Amino acid sequence: MILEEIETRAEAILKKAGVTSLPVPVEEIAEKYQIRISRAPHKDFSGMLIRKDGRALIGVNNSEAEVRQRFTIAHELGHFFLHPNQDAFVDYRDNKNGIMRTQREKQANMFAAALLMPRKLLSKDFKAIAKNGFSDDELHELARRYNVSEDAIRFRLINLNVLALS
């Protein structure tokens, strides 16, 4: 699955869910698709998706920051929509260096970024906020507006070829 397919899929889900404002309400999207979310502290994982008997559950480590929890929910939604034939995914916390182990994990991360930071909205917001230059203050403002981490917004802008890699 290529990035364009993932972007298109995320955009279709946002449209179907009726998302018109920021930050993207990932929990409402999960609810619309009858996916239950359960939060609990856990030392070994950030999130997981379990499917059984036509039902789905996303588990989220609530000891992590809110922006991380939102990304985790979006990531697990990526598995739900992109990988329908696998019943369980567990995303372990030991992956601190950010290197994804499998293609499916990369796809779920791309989906999460596309869902939380829709490309058309983010490109428009970036152009508006950066017309007089772009610094850490503007990056912080965009991260706040989308309720994501500054790293997530930076990587998304770079991947959209809106911001140069520095």
Functional labels for PLM-detected ranges:
Residues 1-166:
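Active-site hotspot residues in diverse enzymes, especially metal/ion-binding acidic/histidine motifs
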